[in-house]
Design a protein with these regions (language model features):
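Aromatic-rich peripheral "rim/lid" segments of glycoside hydrolase catalytic domains that contact
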Residues: 72, 76, 210-270
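Substrate-binding/catalytic cleft of secreted carbohydrate-active enzymes
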Residues: 1-226
């Protein structure tokens, strides 16, 4: 709801021009390039500092100005890969991209077909720089109403309270556990299928999720297998998750999930 309501006392709660994007914001435009310079001076020799991106989905910013900042960093310290923004726009100075979509090419993630004999190599292979799939998945899980009790002190779960009132109105409040388990099982299947699809794509440089926890900063995004307090929802264990998201994952390619008794199951193994 916060995107549709103008709140004069809280301008940061609307994306319609507030706050102004980089390149249009004098105070930030002075701070950000100076801070970027300080970052590479302070952490430039750290072995984990392999990539730098100015920010996330900077769609309301001036990409030409930000590109100048990136070029300055590349000239000063070319030891890592640089990018201007995740998603939104790809610029000539970008040395990698984190995006939902490769321009004029196609989407970076999705589940295709009725089996596992598929990937997104036809899209990724056309890119001239490494591509990381951005905020993949985001499959929601029906909430448990007892999570509301965790919000104490200055915290109130108004988003969950609103959803619970809808459930009360529709006489299904008592079914939250069943809906939670069913949607959680579906979430696991979808994440597994999506991640394995990316792992089957040789040219995919990686993927990132919105969050493994629920995100309550925009009303609600119940997309995690952990809740907003980092507590397990009881959907999946770490050991189970690592079976399909790990350094090495055995994969099986087969063209359909349903086989008849008179058919011989065939699959191609990929690691």
């Amino acid at each position: 709801w916060w995107m549709s309501v103008v709140r004069k006392e809280r301008p940061e709660m609307t994306t319609r021009g507030l706050p102004k994007g980089l390149g249009h914001n004098p105070s930030a435009d002075k701070f950000v390039p100076e801070e970027l310079q300080r970052m590479i001076e302070a952490y430039g020799n750290h072995p984990s500092f392999t990539m730098l991106c100015i920010g996330n989905e900077l769609g309301n910013s001036n990409f030409d100005i930000m590109q100048q900042w990136i070029k300055s960093l590349q000239e000063k310290d070319p030891r890592r890969l640089y990018a201007i923004s995740t998603a939104r726009k790809i610029m000539p100075a970008d040395q990698y991209m984190v995006t939902h979509n490769i321009p004029q090419t196609g989407g970076t993630y999705g589940i295709n077909g009725s089996g596992t004999d598929n990937d997104r190599e036809s899209i990724y292979s056309k890119a001239t720089i490494p591509v990381i799939a951005h905020e993949v998945g985001q499959y929601p899980v029906y909430p448990l109403w007892n999570e509301i009790d965790k919000y104490t002190g200055v915290l109130e779960a108004r988003n969950l309270e609103s959803l619970r009132q809808q459930a009360v109105k529709n006489h299904i409040e008592h079914q939250d556990r069943k809906f939670h388990e069913a949607s959680g099982a579906l979430q696991t299947i979808l994440y597994k299928g999506l991640i394995e699809n990316l792992l089957r794509t040789p040219s995919c440089a990686g993927f990132q999720m919105l969050s493994m926890t629920d995100y309550s900063g925009q009303g609600e995004a119940l997309v995690g297998w952990l809740d907003s307090f980092w507590d397990s929802k009881g959907i999946i264990t770490p050991e189970q998750f690592r079976c399909y998201s790990n350094d090495i994952v055995p994969l099986a390619r087969f063209h359909k999930y349903t086989w008849q008794t008179d058919e011989t199951f065939k699959a191609q193994i990929q690691v």
